Amino acid sequence: MLKRIMSILIMGIMVIGMTACGKAAEKEVSKGPEGELSAIIDQIYEKKNTDLMLETTKLDLTDTEILKYNTGLSDASLVKEAAISEALISSQAYSLILVRVKDSKDAKTVAQEMLDGVNQSKWICVTADDLKVAGCGDVVLLVMVASNMSDTVTSEQIVEAFKAVAGGNLDFTLEK
């Protein structure tokens, strides 16, 4: 009887041990900033004034050409919504894009595709050579700016403002 009880206890301990070892600790993803993307963009600009004349627009995710042109994404299958803020003067290479993904697990994948796919010379006569992508939860930020505008704004300053809006933590930052 004692052997049977000991066998059951040992098997129970082994099952618990195997179950605990089988579950890998997943990296906890932050909860992204809440609210409309345009409101998040406004909050970023409250933290870092660019001194540029800017316009913020919600992107039509069904228009794949506009999506690719502005975000570098070839399709919107992982995206819930997107907004862009750009200088009204086309000779100023500045663009801030926020994308909210459907599932925060896909944020870094979307961010990498944005980094690899965005055209930093989309303005033709100027190039945004200072580029960073950052993510917090389900929100991905891409900011690109011409380095000759560094006395006004840099991608690092916008990423830091986004970090502050996101509660002080970012899940990742990518750059070229």
How should these model regions be labeled?
Residues 21-95, 101-176:
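Soluble, non-membrane globular domain cores that form compact, hydrophobic packing
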Residues 16-20:
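C-terminal motif of bacterial Sec signal peptides marking the signal peptidase cleavage site
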Residues 1-5, 9-12:
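Positively charged n-region of N-terminal signal peptides that target proteins for export
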